[in-house]
Amino acid sequence: MSLPDISRRRSPVPQEDWPLTPNALRPSPFPNPVLQALYSLSRVLLFPTYWSLDQLLGCWAPSVRSKSLGWFKVLAGSGVLLPLVVVGLPLALVGLALWLPLQVWRRPFCYQPPPACWVWPQPWHPPAERRRCFVFLTANLCLLPHGLAHFNNLSHSLQRAEAVGAALLDSLQSSQYRVSECSQPPPRVPGGELKATLPMGLDFVCLQEVFDLRAARRLVRVLVPNLGPVIYDVGTFGLMAGPYIKVLGSGLLLASRYPLLRATFRCFPNARREDAMASKGLLSVQAQLGIVDGHPIVGYLHCTHLHAPVEDGHIRCKQLTLLLEWVEEFEAENRQSDEAVAFSVLLGDLNFDNCSQDHAKEQGHKLFSCFQDPCRLGVCQEQPWALGTILNSSMLRHSIACSPEMLRRALRQEKGRRLYLSGPLHGSYPAQSWKGRRLDYITYRRVPGSRLSPEAEQVTFSTAFAGLTDHLAMGLKLQVVCS
């Protein structure tokens, strides 16, 4: 896919001493190139067996077995792939012996800075510019390794990553990176809309389930020259207390239009079943946004993906409590006394909804007294315009579910929502208010003592990734006003 560099086409603006702290993050996750080279070698040794096992697992997925000649394909594929696994095992054991101890020195994320020709967005300078809007996007892409993706009725993760990148690129090119215009005054109640495209003027993008590193790198190649710095390959791998062996990362990927000052990742200590193999946790970053009275303006983003199994609500509640503790710790440790904080945003796939009785504990968690959810009115009460974000897995290959515009039209009607969205786990809505299950959240809060006040202006539910994942993308336009 050709990746035009729209950063070169933007008109540079006078930006003396901006960013205030350039190159704040080291690109490599290792402190020296020798460790990085050894880590790359370990991945090369592991890859043949990883690929063979991945393809073998894909052969046994229910979606493959149910097709015509399904069992014949399963047996034929297994007959070819099993010998490849056996042949690759000696190399894999050497690679594993090298890979495991290297995790001690590995920082839990990779950082890709923008190119040298990159022009940063114009810094925010209140009170001359009293208000500025920031646009956030969250999306669960289900970019699992090929075999695991089949179990979600999806496949071809690398091809889907290319298509997701094309959709993101189209949004970035269309917006041409003008600063998003704000409503004056800000609306008393945020509005919501359903679109077949992604929000324009994206400033921050948080993606979940980008587990496949090859897929992550394809997204990085799109985002870095057209949006800004990217943090990817996030997670703590290797042997953990439990005991667990973490072979998958967190699946988180974060891209920012603004310079990033600091970043950290913390892995949840509690996990069960299939989630025990993944390094789910909280990625926290501090971004530079502008300057007020000679002092820096910063914003905090906290991206996460909670425990998945439906019946494990107690684990999700513990993770939510940990999230709040880690958010407070990160912001307290990194905030300087002279900094003005524009916002603190927590976003991602929380894996519970606001309509199912099975999620009563999560719905009443103190998270919602600390952070504002613009889609939520209360426990089991959503805004009239709010929508579910998880699709019905049995309909993912339907022609309408694979077309952004056709899916958007279908979801405008209750009949379409009931057909293409996943419904509550137990019980049902009244007929006039059926919305589906919203697992994706973008929440925000004002930091006490700050003269900057954030307010939600617009929430967007997007079908732009129709046919590419089992979630709708979700966007938030946040207006920050300097008092």
From Swiss-Prot:
It is an enzyme of class 3 (hydrolase). InterPro entries: Endo/exonu/phosph_ase_sf, Sph/SMPD2-like, Sphingomyelinase/PLipase_C. Highly expressed in testis, pancreas, epididymis, and brain. GO terms for molecular function: metal ion binding; sphingomyelin phosphodiesterase activity. Residues 1-20 are annotated as: Disordered. GO terms for biological process: ceramide biosynthetic process; ceramide metabolic process; sphingomyelin catabolic process. GO terms for cellular component: endoplasmic reticulum membrane; extracellular region; mitochondrial inner membrane; mitochondrial membrane; mitochondrion. The keyword Mitochondrion applies. It is found in: Mitochondrion inner membrane; Endoplasmic reticulum membrane. Optimum pH is 7.5. Pathway: Lipid metabolism; sphingolipid metabolism. The chain crosses the membrane at residues 80-100. The keyword Phosphoprotein does not apply. Catalyzes the hydrolysis of membrane sphingomyelin to form phosphorylcholine and ceramide. This is Sphingomyelin phosphodiesterase 5. It comes from Mus musculus (Mouse). The gene is Smpd5.
